Amino acid sequence: MKLNALWIAAIASLAMAGCNKAESPAEVQHDTAAAQADAQRDMADATADAREDNADAAKDVNDAVADNDADDAADQAQDASETAAKGEYKVAVAAAEANHKVAVEKCEALSGNAQDDCKNRADSDLDNAKRQAERRRDGTG
């Protein structure tokens, strides 16, 4: 029975040794470049979506103004303002997530506790950026 416990402990320690292991500089550079490329695509998509939504909202406002409907124009203007805030939020979150992806890949160059700390900082930065984006969207920041 003691032999089984020793084998289990040995296997567990070998498995744990592979965790938080630093990647080679070339591997980190490759992964970071890939994360940056993904981040640029994500940012471009979020920005394009926000622009499209804002253009649609502006068209609705212009249509209401052209119809000489003051109440509808006011409603559409409010909707356009909310659409702009949502778009800014989406872009800010995309930027935060993009920065997070790149930061986490850079953390892979570290090992052990330094890697854990680096990833925890990246996670914390992401959470803070998302909260800040929410406050701006909601008009409280």
Which residues does each PLM region occupy?
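Bacterial signal peptide processing site
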Residues: 18-23
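Juxtamembrane extracytosolic/periplasmic "stalk" immediately C-terminal to the first targeting helix
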Residues: 27-35
